[in-house]
Amino acid sequence: IIGMKEKSRVSQYDVVYHSPGKSDRSAMPLGNGELAVSVWMDEKGVLRFYLARTDAVTELDRTVKLGMVEVRTAPGFLSDGDFIQRLELEHGIVHMKSCGKELWIWVDDASDIVYVSGRMKQEMKVKVRYYTWRTEKNLPWNSPVRSTGLTEAADMVDELEDRICFRHINGENGIEHLARLQCVDDLSCVPDLLSGRIFGGIMYLEGGRRVGHELVKGECTDFCLKVATHSAQLEEKEWLDRVDGMLKGSRTADESREATAVSWEAFWKKSYIFVEGDKERKPVCNERILDCVSEPMECTGTASPVTRGYLLTKYMLACCKDGNFPVFYNGMLFNLCPGNREHLGVMEFVSGFTRIPCGEYPTLSINPDERSWSNEHLWQNLRLPYYTMLATG
């Protein structure tokens, strides 16, 4: 059983930033097993995060993001020389502080809802916006069904009085085409997990209202943003009712944060490994990849690079390994935008880790939906998470 000493040792490996990021390469991971979030604070003081689910799968069988959320405060969140961002491993929370302003971001342990809670010493205005780059029907550049004429439908966004609803509704898919290519004539034996699938969510800012394309809360010293997500093969109205019900039945921010922290503490109690005697060990990693890491990052009290790697990998796996669909791809649900505005499949391998920002916003052609080794569950696309899961029992 893990005791207080071991719990404090987990916290020693919290990841800490002392300045905001230059791009989504600065993102920290969060998740509850199904819903995963990549969150970062940019140099303008804007909080951004991607949403991802294991079962957010398009009609072309691509595992994609649900979109991106942006949170702004006025006055801005950042103050010169006073910023700290911590990934609290023990509690599964990202905590940011800057001169009397604090943000907490987490994924609820019992429902697929992202919470962003803020507290400020002085009154501020809060603005929240949802972005999707799938704004028109599209055929991804490396799609294996290019010859069929199939495309992915555009996402739908409804801007309501006090919330924003976003979703992707799968259109015609390529299951029959791909089955024929494999000489499978009896389609009844081929599971269809794509037809009629809807994935997305509803974004709600407590005490706020919609102004233009944003949810806005006037002068306030605290706020709570909830983003409820869902994916299922349902009729559209039933899907909307289900997500709306998730919001109505959701916990308060304090209840959710406390329960989620307890859940993560229980996770770390199940098993643990702490290695000693390797403090001087150099990371086994391509130097050109290490050169791309320019964040002023620290792991407080890190005594063991091996332990750090083990704990951080175990944490990331826990964020997305218990979903409706299996863990997919080496990057799991935390893939980011390609660097240099180059498609991943045609660039030199190491340049995929570039720190050069892809631009402020993803586009229809360059976005974090992209994966360099296509979408199949091939061994080379799965070896990193599954080897690790085997090693951790």
Which functions belong to the PLM regions below?
Residues I366-S374, L378-W379, R383-L390:
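Zinc-dependent metallopeptidase catalytic helix centered on the HExxH motif
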Residues I2-R25, L30-N375:
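Acidic/polar, glycine-enriched structural segments that form the non-catalytic walls/loops
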